[in-house]
Design a protein with these regions (language model features):
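Alpha-helical transmembrane bundle of multi-pass membrane proteins
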Residues: 1-205, 222-332
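Short intracellular "coupling" helices and adjacent cytoplasmic loop segments at the cytosolic face
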Residues: 206-216
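Loop segments that connect adjacent transmembrane helices in multi-pass transporters
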Residues: 214, 221-222
Length: 332
Protein backbone atom coordinates (compact mmCIF):
# COMPACT_ATOMS: atom_id res chain seq x y z
CA UNK A 1 0.00 0.00 0.00
CA UNK A 2 2.70 2.50 1.01
CA UNK A 3 4.73 1.56 -2.06
CA UNK A 4 1.85 2.70 -4.27
CA UNK A 5 1.04 5.74 -2.12
CA UNK A 6 4.57 7.13 -1.98
CA UNK A 7 5.19 6.40 -5.65
CA UNK A 8 2.22 8.50 -6.83
CA UNK A 9 1.77 11.20 -4.16
CA UNK A 10 4.40 13.37 -5.83
CA UNK A 11 2.35 13.56 -9.04
CA UNK A 12 -0.47 15.45 -7.30
CA UNK A 13 1.91 17.69 -5.35
CA UNK A 14 3.97 18.49 -8.44
CA UNK A 15 2.04 21.56 -9.70
CA UNK A 16 2.47 23.22 -6.30
CA UNK A 17 5.92 22.32 -4.94
CA UNK A 18 7.46 23.30 -8.29
CA UNK A 19 6.09 26.81 -7.81
CA UNK A 20 7.21 26.90 -4.16
CA UNK A 21 10.81 25.91 -5.00
CA UNK A 22 10.90 28.02 -8.17
CA UNK A 23 11.63 25.15 -10.56
CA UNK A 24 8.50 25.39 -12.73
CA UNK A 25 10.62 26.44 -15.72
CA UNK A 26 13.62 24.21 -14.99
CA UNK A 27 13.14 20.76 -16.60
CA UNK A 28 16.37 19.40 -15.11
CA UNK A 29 15.35 20.18 -11.53
CA UNK A 30 11.82 18.93 -12.21
CA UNK A 31 13.25 15.64 -13.42
CA UNK A 32 15.56 15.40 -10.41
CA UNK A 33 12.65 15.97 -8.00
CA UNK A 34 10.67 13.21 -9.70
CA UNK A 35 13.50 10.69 -10.09
CA UNK A 36 15.34 11.11 -6.77
CA UNK A 37 13.02 8.57 -5.13
CA UNK A 38 13.80 6.08 -7.90
CA UNK A 39 17.52 6.29 -7.09
CA UNK A 40 16.75 5.48 -3.47
CA UNK A 41 14.45 2.70 -4.66
CA UNK A 42 17.31 1.12 -6.59
CA UNK A 43 19.55 0.94 -3.53
CA UNK A 44 16.67 -0.23 -1.32
CA UNK A 45 15.82 -3.09 -3.66
CA UNK A 46 19.47 -4.14 -3.96
CA UNK A 47 20.04 -4.17 -0.21
CA UNK A 48 16.71 -5.67 0.94
CA UNK A 49 17.67 -9.28 0.21
CA UNK A 50 21.06 -9.18 1.93
CA UNK A 51 19.75 -7.29 4.96
CA UNK A 52 16.72 -9.55 5.42
CA UNK A 53 18.82 -12.72 5.02
CA UNK A 54 21.17 -11.52 7.74
CA UNK A 55 18.76 -9.84 10.18
CA UNK A 56 15.39 -11.39 9.37
CA UNK A 57 12.35 -10.21 7.44
CA UNK A 58 10.57 -8.55 10.35
CA UNK A 59 13.32 -6.08 11.42
CA UNK A 60 13.77 -4.88 7.84
CA UNK A 61 10.02 -4.39 7.41
CA UNK A 62 10.06 -2.31 10.60
CA UNK A 63 12.99 -0.32 9.16
CA UNK A 64 11.02 0.33 5.95
CA UNK A 65 8.01 1.50 7.97
CA UNK A 66 10.20 3.89 9.96
CA UNK A 67 11.69 5.28 6.75
CA UNK A 68 8.19 5.83 5.32
CA UNK A 69 7.32 7.91 8.40
CA UNK A 70 10.58 9.82 8.04
CA UNK A 71 10.00 10.67 4.38
CA UNK A 72 6.33 11.61 4.95
CA UNK A 73 7.14 14.03 7.75
CA UNK A 74 10.40 15.33 6.32
CA UNK A 75 9.30 15.92 2.73
CA UNK A 76 6.36 18.01 3.88
CA UNK A 77 8.37 20.02 6.41
CA UNK A 78 11.31 21.17 4.30
CA UNK A 79 11.93 24.67 2.95
CA UNK A 80 14.98 23.67 0.90
CA UNK A 81 14.85 21.90 -2.46
CA UNK A 82 18.00 19.97 -1.53
CA UNK A 83 16.39 18.57 1.62
CA UNK A 84 13.24 17.82 -0.37
CA UNK A 85 15.27 15.51 -2.58
CA UNK A 86 17.11 13.98 0.38
CA UNK A 87 13.81 12.91 1.95
CA UNK A 88 12.56 11.67 -1.41
CA UNK A 89 15.70 9.51 -1.62
CA UNK A 90 14.89 8.14 1.84
CA UNK A 91 11.34 7.40 0.71
CA UNK A 92 12.66 5.68 -2.39
CA UNK A 93 14.91 3.49 -0.25
CA UNK A 94 11.83 2.46 1.76
CA UNK A 95 9.92 1.71 -1.45
CA UNK A 96 12.78 -0.47 -2.68
CA UNK A 97 12.81 -2.46 0.55
CA UNK A 98 9.03 -2.81 0.77
CA UNK A 99 8.52 -3.73 -2.88
CA UNK A 100 11.19 -6.45 -2.64
CA UNK A 101 10.50 -7.78 0.82
CA UNK A 102 6.69 -7.69 1.12
CA UNK A 103 5.99 -10.33 -1.59
CA UNK A 104 8.83 -12.46 -0.20
CA UNK A 105 7.45 -12.27 3.34
CA UNK A 106 3.91 -13.07 2.18
CA UNK A 107 5.09 -16.06 0.14
CA UNK A 108 7.13 -17.40 3.08
CA UNK A 109 4.42 -17.07 5.70
CA UNK A 110 1.25 -17.91 3.73
CA UNK A 111 -0.05 -21.50 3.63
CA UNK A 112 0.87 -23.19 0.35
CA UNK A 113 -2.72 -23.41 -0.97
CA UNK A 114 -3.25 -19.67 -0.39
CA UNK A 115 0.19 -18.41 -1.38
CA UNK A 116 -0.66 -17.36 -4.93
CA UNK A 117 -3.81 -15.55 -3.85
CA UNK A 118 -2.01 -13.67 -1.07
CA UNK A 119 0.76 -12.52 -3.42
CA UNK A 120 -1.94 -11.28 -5.83
CA UNK A 121 -3.55 -9.35 -2.98
CA UNK A 122 -0.19 -7.66 -2.42
CA UNK A 123 -0.44 -6.20 -5.94
CA UNK A 124 -4.00 -5.10 -5.21
CA UNK A 125 -2.83 -3.20 -2.13
CA UNK A 126 -0.26 -1.38 -4.29
CA UNK A 127 -2.92 -0.06 -6.67
CA UNK A 128 -5.20 0.76 -3.72
CA UNK A 129 -2.33 2.82 -2.31
CA UNK A 130 -2.05 4.60 -5.65
CA UNK A 131 -5.78 5.36 -5.72
CA UNK A 132 -5.82 6.51 -2.08
CA UNK A 133 -2.95 8.90 -2.75
CA UNK A 134 -4.74 10.32 -5.79
CA UNK A 135 -8.00 10.84 -3.86
CA UNK A 136 -6.19 12.45 -0.90
CA UNK A 137 -4.31 14.83 -3.21
CA UNK A 138 -7.55 15.77 -4.98
CA UNK A 139 -9.35 16.45 -1.70
CA UNK A 140 -6.50 18.41 -0.09
CA UNK A 141 -5.91 20.79 -3.00
CA UNK A 142 -8.08 23.90 -3.08
CA UNK A 143 -9.64 24.77 -6.46
CA UNK A 144 -7.22 26.53 -8.79
CA UNK A 145 -8.73 29.17 -11.08
CA UNK A 146 -8.29 28.70 -14.81
CA UNK A 147 -5.53 30.97 -16.05
CA UNK A 148 -3.87 31.23 -12.62
CA UNK A 149 -0.28 32.47 -12.99
CA UNK A 150 2.80 30.84 -11.47
CA UNK A 151 2.94 33.62 -8.89
CA UNK A 152 -0.72 33.16 -7.92
CA UNK A 153 -0.25 29.41 -7.45
CA UNK A 154 2.97 29.90 -5.46
CA UNK A 155 1.34 32.37 -3.05
CA UNK A 156 -1.85 30.32 -2.68
CA UNK A 157 -2.55 27.83 0.12
CA UNK A 158 -1.79 25.03 -2.32
CA UNK A 159 1.62 26.49 -3.12
CA UNK A 160 2.54 27.12 0.51
CA UNK A 161 0.86 24.35 2.51
CA UNK A 162 -1.30 22.11 0.32
CA UNK A 163 1.53 20.08 -1.19
CA UNK A 164 2.99 19.60 2.30
CA UNK A 165 -0.24 18.03 3.58
CA UNK A 166 -0.26 15.69 0.60
CA UNK A 167 3.01 14.20 1.89
CA UNK A 168 2.06 14.46 5.58
CA UNK A 169 -1.13 12.45 4.92
CA UNK A 170 1.09 9.44 4.26
CA UNK A 171 2.12 9.52 7.93
CA UNK A 172 -1.16 7.82 8.89
CA UNK A 173 -0.71 4.55 6.92
CA UNK A 174 3.04 4.65 7.59
CA UNK A 175 2.47 4.83 11.36
CA UNK A 176 -0.05 1.96 11.18
CA UNK A 177 2.47 -0.11 9.20
CA UNK A 178 5.15 0.66 11.80
CA UNK A 179 2.98 -0.34 14.77
CA UNK A 180 1.58 -3.52 13.20
CA UNK A 181 5.04 -4.59 11.99
CA UNK A 182 5.95 -5.30 15.62
CA UNK A 183 2.97 -7.65 15.89
CA UNK A 184 3.90 -9.63 12.78
CA UNK A 185 5.60 -13.00 13.34
CA UNK A 186 9.03 -13.51 11.88
CA UNK A 187 9.12 -15.53 8.66
CA UNK A 188 9.15 -19.20 9.71
CA UNK A 189 11.19 -20.09 6.62
CA UNK A 190 13.86 -17.58 7.59
CA UNK A 191 13.82 -18.91 11.16
CA UNK A 192 14.24 -22.48 9.91
CA UNK A 193 17.06 -21.56 7.52
CA UNK A 194 18.78 -19.71 10.37
CA UNK A 195 18.75 -22.77 12.62
CA UNK A 196 15.91 -21.53 14.86
CA UNK A 197 13.83 -24.68 14.46
CA UNK A 198 11.64 -24.33 17.56
CA UNK A 199 10.74 -20.73 16.75
CA UNK A 200 9.83 -21.73 13.18
CA UNK A 201 7.70 -24.61 14.46
CA UNK A 202 5.86 -22.24 16.79
CA UNK A 203 5.01 -19.81 13.97
CA UNK A 204 3.88 -22.59 11.63
CA UNK A 205 1.70 -24.01 14.42
CA UNK A 206 0.01 -20.62 14.87
CA UNK A 207 -0.68 -20.52 11.14
CA UNK A 208 -2.08 -23.99 10.52
CA UNK A 209 -1.84 -26.27 13.52
CA UNK A 210 0.66 -28.89 14.67
CA UNK A 211 0.36 -31.24 11.70
CA UNK A 212 0.77 -28.40 9.21
CA UNK A 213 3.79 -27.11 11.14
CA UNK A 214 5.58 -30.47 11.11
CA UNK A 215 4.90 -30.97 7.37
CA UNK A 216 6.07 -27.49 6.35
CA UNK A 217 9.18 -27.63 8.50
CA UNK A 218 10.11 -31.04 7.12
CA UNK A 219 9.73 -29.71 3.56
CA UNK A 220 12.00 -26.74 4.31
CA UNK A 221 14.64 -28.94 5.91
CA UNK A 222 14.51 -31.38 2.97
CA UNK A 223 14.96 -28.51 0.50
CA UNK A 224 17.88 -27.14 2.52
CA UNK A 225 19.54 -30.56 2.55
CA UNK A 226 19.34 -30.74 -1.25
CA UNK A 227 20.84 -27.28 -1.69
CA UNK A 228 24.51 -27.73 -2.53
CA UNK A 229 25.55 -24.08 -2.50
CA UNK A 230 24.29 -20.68 -1.44
CA UNK A 231 22.58 -18.49 -4.00
CA UNK A 232 24.30 -15.30 -5.11
CA UNK A 233 24.65 -12.84 -7.95
CA UNK A 234 27.58 -14.86 -9.33
CA UNK A 235 25.22 -17.73 -10.15
CA UNK A 236 23.44 -15.45 -12.61
CA UNK A 237 26.56 -15.63 -14.81
CA UNK A 238 26.06 -19.37 -15.27
CA UNK A 239 25.21 -20.01 -18.98
CA UNK A 240 22.32 -22.22 -17.88
CA UNK A 241 20.70 -19.14 -16.34
CA UNK A 242 21.01 -16.85 -19.38
CA UNK A 243 17.59 -17.55 -20.90
CA UNK A 244 15.67 -17.23 -17.63
CA UNK A 245 17.70 -14.17 -16.64
CA UNK A 246 17.11 -12.47 -20.00
CA UNK A 247 13.36 -13.09 -19.88
CA UNK A 248 13.12 -11.81 -16.31
CA UNK A 249 15.20 -8.67 -16.88
CA UNK A 250 13.63 -7.74 -20.23
CA UNK A 251 10.10 -8.26 -18.87
CA UNK A 252 10.87 -6.05 -15.86
CA UNK A 253 12.40 -3.31 -18.02
CA UNK A 254 9.57 -3.30 -20.55
CA UNK A 255 7.02 -3.24 -17.73
CA UNK A 256 8.60 -0.03 -16.43
CA UNK A 257 8.73 1.39 -19.96
CA UNK A 258 5.06 0.65 -20.64
CA UNK A 259 4.16 4.29 -19.93
CA UNK A 260 1.95 4.12 -16.83
CA UNK A 261 4.65 5.85 -14.75
CA UNK A 262 4.42 8.83 -17.11
CA UNK A 263 0.63 8.93 -16.78
CA UNK A 264 0.75 8.92 -12.98
CA UNK A 265 3.78 11.15 -12.37
CA UNK A 266 3.50 13.60 -15.25
CA UNK A 267 -0.29 13.85 -15.40
CA UNK A 268 0.01 17.62 -14.92
CA UNK A 269 1.80 18.10 -18.24
CA UNK A 270 -0.29 15.51 -20.10
CA UNK A 271 -3.71 16.79 -19.07
CA UNK A 272 -2.82 20.50 -19.17
CA UNK A 273 -1.51 20.01 -22.71
CA UNK A 274 -4.97 18.65 -23.52
CA UNK A 275 -6.57 21.84 -22.16
CA UNK A 276 -7.42 20.88 -18.57
CA UNK A 277 -6.88 23.14 -15.56
CA UNK A 278 -4.89 22.10 -12.47
CA UNK A 279 -8.01 21.13 -10.46
CA UNK A 280 -9.33 19.06 -13.37
CA UNK A 281 -5.94 17.33 -13.62
CA UNK A 282 -6.19 16.09 -10.02
CA UNK A 283 -9.71 14.75 -10.64
CA UNK A 284 -8.68 13.04 -13.88
CA UNK A 285 -5.79 11.32 -12.08
CA UNK A 286 -8.35 9.78 -9.71
CA UNK A 287 -10.21 8.37 -12.73
CA UNK A 288 -7.00 6.65 -13.91
CA UNK A 289 -6.53 5.21 -10.41
CA UNK A 290 -10.07 3.81 -10.29
CA UNK A 291 -9.54 2.19 -13.69
CA UNK A 292 -6.26 0.72 -12.44
CA UNK A 293 -7.97 -0.86 -9.41
CA UNK A 294 -10.87 -2.28 -11.47
CA UNK A 295 -8.60 -4.03 -13.97
CA UNK A 296 -6.26 -5.28 -11.24
CA UNK A 297 -9.21 -6.99 -9.55
CA UNK A 298 -10.34 -8.37 -12.92
CA UNK A 299 -6.85 -9.77 -13.58
CA UNK A 300 -6.84 -11.48 -10.17
CA UNK A 301 -10.00 -13.39 -11.10
CA UNK A 302 -8.96 -14.47 -14.61
CA UNK A 303 -5.19 -14.98 -14.32
CA UNK A 304 -5.45 -18.68 -13.40
CA UNK A 305 -8.03 -19.29 -16.12
CA UNK A 306 -6.37 -17.34 -18.96
CA UNK A 307 -2.73 -17.72 -17.94
CA UNK A 308 0.04 -15.21 -17.27
CA UNK A 309 1.27 -15.04 -20.86
CA UNK A 310 -2.18 -14.36 -22.31
CA UNK A 311 -2.83 -11.54 -19.85
CA UNK A 312 0.59 -10.03 -20.59
CA UNK A 313 -0.10 -10.07 -24.33
CA UNK A 314 -3.58 -8.60 -23.88
CA UNK A 315 -2.27 -5.85 -21.61
CA UNK A 316 0.65 -5.02 -23.91
CA UNK A 317 -1.57 -4.84 -26.99
CA UNK A 318 -4.12 -2.72 -25.13
CA UNK A 319 -1.43 -0.27 -24.00
CA UNK A 320 -0.06 0.04 -27.54
CA UNK A 321 -3.52 0.84 -28.93
CA UNK A 322 -4.42 3.27 -26.14
CA UNK A 323 -1.13 5.19 -26.34
CA UNK A 324 -1.49 5.44 -30.12
CA UNK A 325 -4.91 7.04 -29.72
CA UNK A 326 -3.69 9.28 -26.89
CA UNK A 327 -0.80 10.55 -28.98
CA UNK A 328 -3.04 11.13 -31.99
CA UNK A 329 -5.61 12.97 -29.85
CA UNK A 330 -3.16 15.85 -29.32
CA UNK A 331 -3.19 16.54 -33.07
CA UNK A 332 -6.91 16.22 -33.84
Amino acid sequence: FLFGYDWVVIGGAKPFYEQYFGIANDPVMQGWAMSSALIGCLFGALSAGKLSDRLGRKPILILAAGLFICTAVGTGAVHSFTLFNVFRLVGGFAIGIASSLSPMYIAEIAPAHLRGRFVSINQLTVVLGILTSQIVNWQIAEPVALGATHEMIRESWNGQMGWRWMFWAMTVPAALFFVFSFILPESPRWLASSGKREAALKVFTRMGGKEYAVTELAAIEAASACQTQEGGYRQLLNPAMYKVLTIGVVMAILQQWCGINVIFNYAQELFMAAGYGVSDVLMNIVVTGITNVIFTILAMFVVDRWGRKALTLIGSFGLAVIYTFMGAAYYF
